[in-house]
Structures are given as structure tokens and as C-alpha cells.
A protein has these predicted regions:
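Conserved class I S-adenosyl-L-methionine
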Residues: 1-24, 37-41, 124-153
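Class I SAM-dependent methyltransferase SAM/SAH-binding core
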Residues: 29, 35-85
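A short acidic, Gly/Pro-enriched loop at the edge of an enzyme's catalytic core
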Residues: 87-96
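A short glycine-rich, Lys/Arg-flanked "PGG" loop and its adjoining helix->strand segment in the class I
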Residues: 109-124
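Short alpha-helix
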Residues: 161-178
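Conserved S-adenosyl-L-methionine
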Residues: 180-190
Length: 200
């Protein structure tokens, strides 16, 4: 069971679950949860009323079920795309978060409004994403994706879109969607080992 919660790329330093605020008794959603390690940590150590870990990957969902299925019903592992999930979950969540998850891999003009609708009044969205591209290239100055090489669970070549955007671009997107009290922090990676992270 993960005993720490990290936002940075290296998963080894910086702020932890406190960035989410007090989630005790709250309904929480992890967007693009992968193997649900962050969601499992919250379920065990921070006592939310309910936490839903959403991921579309069958392989990730299977691994999460093997590792953390025993944490039900507090932890719900949901195999689904984040957009359809959020669009059918209006005013469900007190807190939504993404640790290098769906926020970086979903068109922000679609995801951010869906997240805003799924949050209850006064709800919070917190996420971490790349502050620059993995190869060191700067983040995009406008809303455009980068094509990434990937592999399917069967090992076949595939492509993914990733949105690596400059701070002012994210800030404008969040503001246009209606989010308020927007703040950001750059978590610097170890030189030569890990990229910098931007946490919102």
C-alpha cells in the first residue's frame, strides 16, 4: 500500500495529499488513475467518503483491481474514459485530481468543462502535468497537442496526444471554464533525471 502521495514526475519529493485539502468525508475522483496507487493511498490514509479511480485502459484497470480491489466499497475502480464518466456525473465530486493522468492526455476544451460540471459548488480540481516536454523542448504557447509514440497492450505501435502547455495557457483555459482561485507551482526535477512538473 503506498504510504506517500507525490505530485512530481519522479514520485519522490514535493507536496503530498495536502494539496487536495481535507478530503475526509468527501467524494473524490482520480482522472486517469492508472493502477490507482494514489487513490488507494487516499482511501486508506485520508478517509474520503468515496473515491472513484477512473481509467480507460483494460490493462491498468486489471492491475488496479488485483492490487486494490479489496479496498471497495470506499475505493471504486472504474474502467471508463474520463469524458463520458464526468459527463454523466454532474455535481458528484467535491475534489477531482490528476497526477500526470487524463488532464495531460485529453483535449482541455472538452475535459475542463466536463470536470467543472462534475464538481459540486465549491469543489476543487488539482492536477500535475509536464512543465516542458520530456526531451527538454519548451511547452506550447497555445492549445496544441504533441504526438507521442506508444504501444498497445499487445505491443503494437500506436500514437497518443499529450498537451504540454505554458502556464499562461493553462491559466486562461481554467479561467475561461469558470475556475477561480487558480494557483500553480513548479516542482523542479533532478537535473538530468526527471522533467519539471507544473502543479495546479
Amino acid at each position: 500500500m503506498p504510504d506517500r502521495f507525490f505530485w512530481n514526475w519522479g514520485q519522490d519529493s514535493g507536496p503530498g495529499a495536502e494539496a487536495l485539502g481535507d478530503v475526509t468525508g468527501r467524494c473524490v475522483g482520480d482522472l486517469g488513475a492508472g493502477t490507482a496507487r494514489h487513490a488507494a493511498h487516499l482511501a486508506v490514509h485520508h478517509q474520503p467518503a468515496h473515491i472513484t479511480a477512473v481509467d480507460a485502459s483494460p490493462a491498468q484497470h486489471a492491475m488496479a483491481s488485483d492490487l486494490y480491489g479489496h479496498l471497495a466499497p470506499r475505493l471504486c475502480l472504474t474502467r471508463c474514459g474520463v469524458l463520458p464518466h464526468l459527463r454523466t456525473s454532474a455535481h458528484t465530486y467535491d475534489v477531482l485530481y490528476s497526477v500526470f493522468g487524463a488532464i495531460g492526455f485529453t483535449e482541455p476544451h472538452e475535459l475542463l468543462p466536463a470536470a467543472a460540471t462534475a464538481l459540486r459548488p465549491g469543489g476543487r480540481l488539482t492536477f500535475s502535468t509536464l512543465a516542458h516536454h520530456l526531451g527538454g523542448a519548451p511547452a506550447h504557447p497555445d492549445v496544441q497537442h504533441t504526438d507521442m509514440s506508444a504501444k498497445t497492450p499487445d505491443g503494437e505501435a500506436a500514437h497518443m496526444h499529450r498537451w504540454v502547455l505554458q502556464e499562461q495557457v493553462w491559466r486562461q483555459l481554467l479561467d475561461e471554464t469558470g475556475f477561480t482561485r487558480i494557483s500553480t507551482e513548479v516542482l523542479h526535477g533532478q537535473p538530468g533525471r526527471a522533467p519539471s512538473t507544473r502543479s495546479w
